């Protein structure tokens, strides 16, 4: 499909601008704001009839505002006769609410949001490192889940690692850690065994694996309060780890994240720009950001030209 147009909400303006620059296009002209009562107000200020439209919007904090911006923009574009609408969601919020645990009386909010997107008229979704890949099955439209972790891996190769070992911060992240370990010449793995007695709190129980005098690479899909990673780093250092690096795609950094990172034993935290960092986080000396703009721009180009997305990750 030709006549590609890019639009952006207010969640990741710098990333959206960078993607547009990589594709040699200008961001579409749209007014995205609020009425005096807080309701989302959107107006598309250019012709989009028949166009292949991409909306770049993370559903990060403020989550509900950014979510509503996205769906209201989709509705405005649909009513303006856009040919195809792809939601580019670098960070997909509500992804952690993807199941009912032991039949507890809770919603599966990831499914609710997926249904919301389908019903409003989104034709396709492009996202990065979903918290659980099976969330793709919640959608009634095609979903491309690209791997920001490969950008992180490329950065790992630039660090002078001494006797590295890849560490999963919990049992659930073993598959992700194993994939990174395989890319790093089948290096060894360790696992942090933790318990989570309640939300946003975890307790490290054991370190499974030998980390003495080794550079430890903690890998995760996101950092929220940072409590898990900081506890993991402390446990690794107590067991003689030489250095501890933490790599994660999505920098949520909520709650006590700043305090946790300031007081942590992590030598460096490396994240991607799927969520904008607050000024105080940006000023932390042990936090560094990598951009996904080139990868997302290439994925958008391939979708628009009906080319394979999986081919991006076959080498």
UniProtKB/Swiss-Prot annotation:
Binding positions for Mg(2+) 1 per the UniProt entry: 131
EC nos: 2.7.6.1
Binding site for D-ribose 5-phosphate: 196, 220, 224-228
One GO MF term: magnesium ion binding
Disulfide pairings: none
InterPro entries, alphabetized: PRib_PP_synth_CS, Pribosyltran_N, PRibTrfase_dom, PRTase-like, Rib-P_diPkinase, Rib-P_diPkinase_bac
Named cofactor requirement(s): Mg(2+)
Main location: cytoplasm
Location(s), subcellular: Cytoplasm
The UniProt record lists the keyword Nucleus: no
Binding site for Mg(2+) 2: 170
EC main group: transferase
Residues that, per the record, bind ATP: 37-39, 96-97
Catalytic reaction equation(s): D-ribose 5-phosphate + ATP = 5-phospho-alpha-D-ribose 1-diphosphate + AMP + H(+)
Pathway: Metabolic intermediate biosynthesis; 5-phospho-alpha-D-ribose 1-diphosphate biosynthesis; 5-phospho-alpha-D-ribose 1-diphosphate from D-ribose 5-phosphate (route I): step 1/1
Pfam families on file: Pribosyl_synth, Pribosyltran_N
GO process terms (BP): 5-phosphoribose 1-diphosphate biosynthetic process; purine nucleotide biosynthetic process; ribonucleoside monophosphate biosynthetic process
Cellular component GO terms, alphabetical: cytoplasm; ribose phosphate diphosphokinase complex
Presence of the UniProt keyword Iron in the record: no
Active site, UniProt feature: 194
Keywords linked to the UniProt accession: ATP-binding, Cytoplasm, Kinase, Magnesium, Metal-binding, Nucleotide biosynthesis, Nucleotide-binding, Transferase
Family statement drawn from the similarity comment of this UniProt entry: Belongs to the ribose-phosphate pyrophosphokinase family. Class I subfamily.
Role played: Involved in the biosynthesis of the central metabolite phospho-alpha-D-ribosyl-1-pyrophosphate (PRPP) via the transfer of pyrophosphoryl group from ATP to 1-hydroxyl of ribose-5-phosphate (Rib-5-P).
Subunit structure: Homohexamer.
Protein name: Ribose-phosphate pyrophosphokinase
Organism expressing this protein natively: Buchnera aphidicola subsp. Baizongia pistaciae (strain Bp)
Lineage, uppermost ranks: Bacteria, Pseudomonadati, Pseudomonadota, Gammaproteobacteria, Enterobacterales
